[in-house]
Amino acid sequence: MAYVKATAILPEKLISEIQKYVQGKTIYIPKPESSHQKWGACSGTRKLIDDRNASIKKAFKNGKTIHQLSDEYHLSIETIKKIVYSK
C-alpha cells in the first residue's frame, strides 16, 4: 500500500470537507466491496484447495477411510471430516 498526498489526487473541495473531520492524520480508503476478490483467487490457491477437496471426497466415496485420507493428505481427522461431510 503506497501513501499518496491527498492534494495530488483529490479535488480541493473534497479535501476541505475531509478536513472538517480529520486533520494531519493518515486515512485508509478501502476498495469498494464489489471489487474484492475471494481469498486465493489471484494466486490460484483457492482452486488447488478446491481440487484437493474434490479428490478427498471422491476417495471417501470410493471406500477410503477418514484415517487413511488423513494420513495421505497430511490433514487432521477433523479437517477430513469437514471436507467429506460438507455439501
UniProtKB/Swiss-Prot annotation:
Entry-linked SUPFAM superfamilies: Homeodomain-like
InterPro entries linked: c-mor_Regulatory_Protein, Homeodomain-like_sf, YraL-like
Coiled coil: none
The protein's name in its UniProt record: Uncharacterized protein YraL
Organism of derivation: Bacillus subtilis (strain 168)
